Amino acid sequence: ENFYKFPLDEFQRDATRVLIDGHSLVVSAPTGSGKTLIGETAIMNALMRGKKAIYTTPLKALSNQKLREFSKKFGKRKVGLKTGDVEVNAEKAEVMVMTTEILRNMLYSNAAGGEMDKRLDDVGVVILDEVHYLGDSYRGTVWEETIIYCPSNIQLLCLSATIGNPDDLSGWIEEVRRSDKSDEKLCKTLVSDYRPVPLNWFYSMKPNRDWPGLGYLLNSRGTQMNEELYPFTEEGMRENFSRYGGEQESYYNYHNNNRRENDQKSMRRRLVPHVETAVGQLISADMLPAVWF
């Protein structure tokens, strides 16, 4: 708490105790609930024990973001980056940020009986951010193999906002990484449903005189779609067609014709903004920085 100059909440204190005790940990909590702070605590705990830390993300953009954040927190000389495209201070860093694929590849050589990657020397903790990617049909094996091949002496911290079965994941991690026959629980679970920062959904369209381009996707109660978007629904288009004298049968003919590929492309040209337009809307709304998928 002295490091952060503000009191930690109960959820963060519980996580800190688990990490200091040396256990691996699965954390499932909404965005904005303090998972990043828990990750930073794991890093500090490793550094204080004279160990190194590895922090993985699924995206290069997120890795770059974490490099900036951790450089401010721990100092540029202590933090490095490796994404496949870029290497920053990779040989000397005590805190390495990388994509999960990079770490998996580092672990492969050791699993295949080769010489242990020197960058894993003295690593005390591996932090897997967005660990729910385990369930991804295309990339999930990367997270699975990373957990399986990670040496059992290295502490694991798995972070996610959306994982649906954290206890099952914790049990599986313990099963594949246990190196003894004791009954002690080596991987624990912490779950929180509290969302201190509200999650808001927005839509972005090309602006014109009828709509501003960027707005809330849901109504003020969060129960239905924003009324501004009603004219673009099938029901809204049918009402508009009838309002201007169209018959229902004619509407269905019109609707089916608009299913054609050229009309869908026309709809996209009219409504979907260019990247520059969408970024300009985010700038005007003071919603940067952002990650574009």
Language-model-detected regions and their locations in the chain:
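Conserved interdomain linker/interface between the two RecA-like ATPase lobes of SF2 helicase motors
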Residues: 148, 155-157, 162-171, 179-293
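Conserved adenine-nucleotide phosphate-binding loops and their immediately adjacent elements
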Residues: 1-3
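Conserved P-loop/Walker A NTP-binding site and adjacent catalytic elements of P-loop NTPases
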Residues: 6-178, 183-197, 201-205, 289-293
